[in-house]
Amino acid sequence: MLLFLACCLAPLALGAQEEPEVITGKADAGRHLYYSAPLGTNGLSCVHCHTDFDEAAQDDGLIRAGHSLYGAASRPNWWGREPEQANAYANIGAAAAVCVEHFQRNPQRLTAQQLVDLRAYLRFINRKQQRQSLALTSGADRTGEYLGFDEGDRIKGRELFYATCHSCHPNARSGIGPALPSDREPAYYAKKVREGDGLGAQIAGLDPNAYDPSSGQFMPYFSVDRLSNRN
């Protein structure tokens, strides 16, 4: 009799165990995170570097270091890591967490809820799907000299400054980023634009150790397809 009761009650006991909670992401909460500077520790938000609209159809007057994330959720990979690689990102939310940790200087990255919320928003803006990989490129000068930037149009340069630099270096003063010196050679500024915090130099194969996450630097680099050498 005791054995019979044990057999009958065992399934009930197992059924009484709590099911693991499934976290559901909300696109509206993810959009809030996308525009939220407090998500990081330095004032940067996702939208500082990536638009959430189709840049070919819309223009807000800014030139960002990163490509638009409109439709990016359907890319086959992110950060140049192929799906079969051991360190590949499972989805765009996991790839975005890298930016939160490094560029936004948040060592805690994202909570599980924030991660699924942000992923939900990036999937929500996936109307124009991108089925091809986005190559991770850099326009860093392989010689490291950055020659040929001595001449330029000052008026055009002013317009470009406000489109690309002003949000982090307001009127060349300190803001999210440090104040910009006005007495350096053109090569100095060109190197900063192309290499950023060192990631641009590493991707170009100039220096495998140029990108150091522990350095405290977080300036993104501008590749040639974001800002041409002429600009």
Language model features with spans:
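Bacterial N-terminal signal peptides
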Residues: 1-11
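Electrostatic cytochrome c docking/interface patches
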Residues: 16-40, 127-160, 178
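N-terminal Sec/ER secretory leader and immediately downstream segment
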Residues: 20, 24-39, 44-47, 51-63, ...
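Extracytoplasmic/secreted proteins, especially bacterial periplasmic and envelope-associated proteins
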Residues: 25, 29-33, 48, 91, ...
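Sec-exported extracytoplasmic/periplasmic mature domains
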Residues: 35-39, 51-54, 97, 101-105, ...
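C-terminal capping alpha-helices of c-type cytochrome domains
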Residues: 93-134, 217-231
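Substrate-binding/catalytic groove segments of enzymes
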Residues: 104-107, 175-177, 198-213
